[in-house]
Amino acid sequence: MTNRPSLSAAPDGNFAVALNASASGWNQAMGIHFVRATADEVIAELEIAAHHRQPYGIVHGGVHSGLIETVASVGAALAALARRQSVVGLENHTSFLNAVREGKLSATARPLMRGRRTQVWEATVTDADGRSVASGRVRFLALEAGDSLAGETVKVKGPSES
């Protein structure tokens, strides 16, 4: 399994700078910028661009769902590190509340439940005026080092291990 990038936290436990410096894949393609990333709260933003819109000119629902999954996943992963675990999403339930065409989106995720084997995180996406445009819950399964995932062995590293 591909190893996740090494992360170094600031003294306050905020991993945002490290996440932004190692942006890749979907996060990079969507232009996601982390403002805060701790085991208790994750905040990320993106500036709406043409590739975020569907044919009616509004932000595609997949962008909202993906943004919710991203902030919840980062928080759940950071919380799991304390147990030397990793996480994988089991379900994402996103509700679209208001259409938005332009400006900045901000997503905030916080844990609802953090157990030994599962976590549930809730997230809200707001527009530049602070109006809620989407909300969702994501449920995660905790993985131990050595577990199998999609035919590969899970490797778990601490926050500053390379």
Role assignments for model-derived ranges:
Residues M1-S162:
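Terminal targeting signals and extreme-terminal segments of soluble enzymes
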